[in-house]
């Protein structure tokens, strides 16, 4: 295991390149199954969730060739299994996308209940609702999810809640189903559109992605293609917070400013200056941080994945801020870590009330999940002195080369191996 050792208290200045979108990559990689041929996927982030997805494809029988650090050729012509191993399924929540892709191509798929971050209940009932609307049967036994169908037929699905995962899984299952599928009350995030674009490049007929109704006309077969994944707007937002929390000056390259608008608006509201270019953003802060009210919502609202980072930033705002979590039930588990640093935060259910303090103090910290871990890193960068962040495996799931990128911006941060005997004593 590793930890990060961070000496904070200095502004971060410089340029950073943003990698491919994690939430698009973990759906697009399973989608290559539908091609039954070769796909060249570019701008893949080098993160553990992507590596796990590639390993799953390999275990299913795909032939995978690494072209460069961010480009892979994937040939799914000769898959010989429709069951994802328990170990790999439980490494990441997004393993459930293999259900939709395997069901769509082979009429059968099986994965273990997925792992990933513990943010409260993440039921798959909306995924299964879509599959059954297409004529599939499902069973959940002994932690295994199995879906099967002799003949998939398009259907009309109105999702009870807006779910990114269910929307994408339904798209994967429907593109090869006979007839027309209509999906209503769907998620509209940029990675939904990216998946639709990729499916269409492979020969699918998907319309309406980015709106709340998606229409899919089933096709008989699909083919391989070359595709480049969109930039990760959450990674970009994280480095914007890094500039804001350290009074820095950071220019982000390889971004789509339109995708950043909900984040950019809030950072401007707290007192940051943001300049927009064609594929870049520059963020600076010189004055005091201002408090604000924030509620996470489905896109185009403020993204839940940015909530822990904004909460960390608002601990230093002058006045009272209120943050309401509108997506996940258990997303404030990290707050105690910020309180250890001197933050003044009261949590009542889904609402956090933050009284700004003048400074955060260094402390031993724990990454309770992916985005909370990133928030701990940003808080440590703002605190004068040395902090340590444990359980960084969560952070590496979603941030490519985060230590190296922060070092290039002037951060004093390094990875340190934790001896096995120290880990066992902690357990």
Regions found by a protein language model. Name each.
Residues 1-427:
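Short, structured segments at the rim of ligand-binding sites
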């Amino acid at each position: 295991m590793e930890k990060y050792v961070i000496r904070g208290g200095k502004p971060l200045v410089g340029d950073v390149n943003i990698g491919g979108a994690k939430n698009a990559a973990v759906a697009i990689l399973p989608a290559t199954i539908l091609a039954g041929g070769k796909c060249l996927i570019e701008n893949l982030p080098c993160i553990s969730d992507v590596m796990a997805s590639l390993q799953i494809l390999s275990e299913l029988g795909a032939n995978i060739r690494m072209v460069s650090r961010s480009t892979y050729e994937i040939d799914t012509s000769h898959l010989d299994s429709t069951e994802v191993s328990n170990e790999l399924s439980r490494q990441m929540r997004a393993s459930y996308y293999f259900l939709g892709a395997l069901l769509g191509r082979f009429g059968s798929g099986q994965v273990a209940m997925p792992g990933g971050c513990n943010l409260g209940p993440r039921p798959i009932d909306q995924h299964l609702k879509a599959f059954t609307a297409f004529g599939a049967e499902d069973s959940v036994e002994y932690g295994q999810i199995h879906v099967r169908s002799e003949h998939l037929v398009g259907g009309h699905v109105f999702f009870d809640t807006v779910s990114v995962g269910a929307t994408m899984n339904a798209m994967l299952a429907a593109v090869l189903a006979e007839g027309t599928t209509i999906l209503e009350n769907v998620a509209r995030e940029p990675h939904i559109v990216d998946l639709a674009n990729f499916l269409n490049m492979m020969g699918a007929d998907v319309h309406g992605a980015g709106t709340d109704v998606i229409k899919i006309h089933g096709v008989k077969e699909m083919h391989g293609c070359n595709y480049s994944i969109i930039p990760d707007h959450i990674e970009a937002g994280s480095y914007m917070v890094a500039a804001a929390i350290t009074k820095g000056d950071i220019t982000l390259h390889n971004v789509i400013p339109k995708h950043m608008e909900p984040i950019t608006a809030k950072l401007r509201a707290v007192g940051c200056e943001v300049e927009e270019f064609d594929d870049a953003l520059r963020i600076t802060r010189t004055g005091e941080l201002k408090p604000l009210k924030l509620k996470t919502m489905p896109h185009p609202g403020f993204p839940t994945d940015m909530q822990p980072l904004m909460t960390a930033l608002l601990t230093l705002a002058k006045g009272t801020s209120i943050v309401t979590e509108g997506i996940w039930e258990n997303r404030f588990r990290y707050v105690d870590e910020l309180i250890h640093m001197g933050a003044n935060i009261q949590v009542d259910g889904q609402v956090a009330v933050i009284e700004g303090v003048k400074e955060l103090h260094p402390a031993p910290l724990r990454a309770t999940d992916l985005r909370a871990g990133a928030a701990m890193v940003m808080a440590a960068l703002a605190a004068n002195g040395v902090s340590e962040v444990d359980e960084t495996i969560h952070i590496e799931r979603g941030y490519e080369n985060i230590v190296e990128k922060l070092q290039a911006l002037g951060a004093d941060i390094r990875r340190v191996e934790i001896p096995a005997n120290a880990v066992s004593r902690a357990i």
